[in-house]
Every structure is written in C-alpha cells, then in structure tokens.
C-alpha cells in the first residue's frame, strides 16, 4: 500500500487498477477501514470487483470508478481483455501474475490514451521485496532474488514501447563492447524508489539484471565483435580467443 501511495503522490496518478492473485487479497486491499488503501491516500475512492460478480453488480462499480476524481479499483480474475475498462494512469501487479498474455493486456490498459485527458505517460508498478543477508551486497541480493514479475512486466512493456526495447538492446551491446553500460536512458523508463537503501546502487543492480533477463545475448556478442574489430582491424576472431570465448 505504501508503494501505491508513493507512486500516486509522486506522479499525480488519478486512476489505478491493481491486480491480485485472490479475491480475498483484492477485497482486503480496498476494504473501508484502517487496513485498506483509502486510509493511506487522502481523497482516494477505492473499489473492488472480481470474477464471481454478475455484470449487474460489477457495471455500476466500474462506472463509479470511471467517474470519480481519484479512484483505485482492485480486481482478481476479472479485468481481462474483453471487459470494458476506462483509460487508467497506472496498473499495479501486487501479487505474482504469471501469464505473459495477461500482463501484456494489463499493461496495455495503462498505455491507452484518453481524449478527455492530456495523458502522455502510463505507469506499471511492481513492488520489489529484497532480502539482504549479512555480508551480502545489494548487487548479490538482486542477482539472487526472484523478480520474475519485473522481467515479465518489462517484456510486456516492450510490446507497447519500442523505445524501451531499443534502450535495452543498446545497453546489452554496450556491455559487449566496453564491459559496462550507462543506464541513464533506462531511468526515463524504469524508476526505482523506496526507503532504507542506496537507491542508486539498487537501481544499477536492477539495470544489470534487466540487461541479463530482457536483453539479447546476440546484441552483447555483437558488441564484443565491434570491440575486437576496433582493436584488431578485422572480425577474424581466433577460434580459441581467450578474452571473449562467446565469440
């Protein structure tokens, strides 16, 4: 809930859909009371729908969500493709959602534009829970963590954002050429925020994993070949060249 609160305040979010694994989790998230999201975000109206609801009950809730000034709706097994949903500013995957098709469809809802607003940016939020053991660096903790939802979300975003796909391609190629990369361009697409850790260190560690998990191995090998050509004047890499065995 705190990550949702921070994102809403930072990016002036007006409409949010949250995705949950179970009806109980979704309903609890938007419950009216101290445990619900409304208790943390002033002037927010929270709603809930799920796949067990009849359309006669769900439709008025969806209208209220669409017509409200600042609204959030939680759902479980409901707001998939084919269900009429208004344009939203952000979708949030608050529990694991493994189907790539579902993730692509959900992120598409955040990417949709609306004639009634001046919206230019859609947001996808995925909370990260990072456990750092004693003596472990943040980079090591990120490498060990299972951030499958992040990688799936970024894979889905590439379906809607060609610039993101191009940025990741160039980062992988740059790492092949220079043994490192500059993630400044990625910061405009992927932002990390939260308490208690060095966010720059965490961001760079996550960027490295993005390059590994989302980028193409071919692009990195191409970068290595570019570096070899710059050093030797040709692309005739010896079969057992020790510096980049991948070539």
Regions found by a protein language model. Name each.
Residues 1-21:
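Conserved interdomain linker/interface between the two RecA-like ATPase lobes of SF2 helicase motors
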Residues 2-4, 27-35, 105-111:
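Short, well-ordered amphipathic alpha-helices
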Residues 9-13, 39-44, 116-121:
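Short helix-terminating capping/connector loops at secondary-structure junctions
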Residues 20-24, 76:
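Helix N-cap/beta->alpha junction signal
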Residues 23-48:
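Conserved helicase motor "Helicase C" RecA-like lobe of SF1/SF2 P-loop NTPases
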Residues 47-168:
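Conserved RecA-like P-loop NTPase helicase motor core
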Residues 180-247:
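IQ-motif-like calmodulin-binding regions
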């Amino acid at each position: 809930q705190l990550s949702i609160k921070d994102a809403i305040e930072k990016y002036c979010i007006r409409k949010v859909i949250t995705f949950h694994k179970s009806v109980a989790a979704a309903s609890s998230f938007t419950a009216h009371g101290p445990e619900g999201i409304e208790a943390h975000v002033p002037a927010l109206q929270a709603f809930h729908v799920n796949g067990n609801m009849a359309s006669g009950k769900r439709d008025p809730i969806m209208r209220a969500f669409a017509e409200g000034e600042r609204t959030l709706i939680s759902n479980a097994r409901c707001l998939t493709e084919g269900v009429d949903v208004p344009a939203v500013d952000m979708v949030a995957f608050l529990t694991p959602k493994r189907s790539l098709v579902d993730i692509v469809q959900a992120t598409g809802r955040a990417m949709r534009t609306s004639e009634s607003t001046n919206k230019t940016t859609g947001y996808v939020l995925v909370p990260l829970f990072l456990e750092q053991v004693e003596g472990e660096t943040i980079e090591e903790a990120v490498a060990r963590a299972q951030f499958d939802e992040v990688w799936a979300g970024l894979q889905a975003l590439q379906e809607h954002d060609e610039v993101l796909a191009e940025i990741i391609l160039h980062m992988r190629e740059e790492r092949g050429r220079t043994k490192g990369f500059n993630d400044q361009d990625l910061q405009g697409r992927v932002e990390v925020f939260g308490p208690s850790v060095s966010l720059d260190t965490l961001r760079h560690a996550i960027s490295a994993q993005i390059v590994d998990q989302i980028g193409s191995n071919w692009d990195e090998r191409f970068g290595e070949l570019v570096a070899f050509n710059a050093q030797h004047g040709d692309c005739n890499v010896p079969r057992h060249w020790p510096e980049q065995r991948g070539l």
